[in-house]
């Protein structure tokens, strides 16, 4: 998948190859 269910969780944990910042930007 590469996308975290929760943005906060992605903040500390890496989602695939992108971070929460990448998801927010996208």
From Swiss-Prot:
GO terms for biological process: defense response to bacterium. Its cofactor is FAD. It is found in: Secreted. It is an enzyme of class 1 (oxidoreductase). It catalyses: an L-alpha-amino acid + O2 + H2O = a 2-oxocarboxylate + H2O2 + NH4(+). The keyword Oxidoreductase applies. Keywords: Antibiotic, Antimicrobial, FAD, Flavoprotein, Hemagglutinin, Oxidoreductase, Secreted, Toxin. One of its GO terms (cellular component) is extracellular region. One of its GO terms (molecular function) is L-amino-acid oxidase activity. Its EC number is 1.4.3.2. Optimum pH is 8. More than 50% activity is retained between pH 3 and 12. Inactive at pH 2. Expressed by the ink gland. Its main location: secreted. Monomer. Catalyzes the oxidative deamination of positively charged L-amino acids L-Lys and L-Arg but not of amino acids L-His, L-Asp or L-Glu. Has antibacterial activity against the Gram-positive bacterium S.aureus (MIC=15 ug/ml). This antibacterial activity is bacteriostatic in the absence of amino acids L-Lys or L-Arg but bactericidal in their presence. The antibacterial effect is largely dependent on H(2)O(2) produced in the oxidative deamination of substrates. Has hemagglutinating activity towards rabbit erythrocytes. This is L-amino-acid oxidase. It comes from Aplysia dactylomela.
């Amino acid at each position: 998948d590469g996308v975290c269910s929760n943005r906060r969780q992605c903040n500390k944990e890496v989602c695939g190859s992108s971070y929460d910042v990448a998801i927010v930007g996208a």
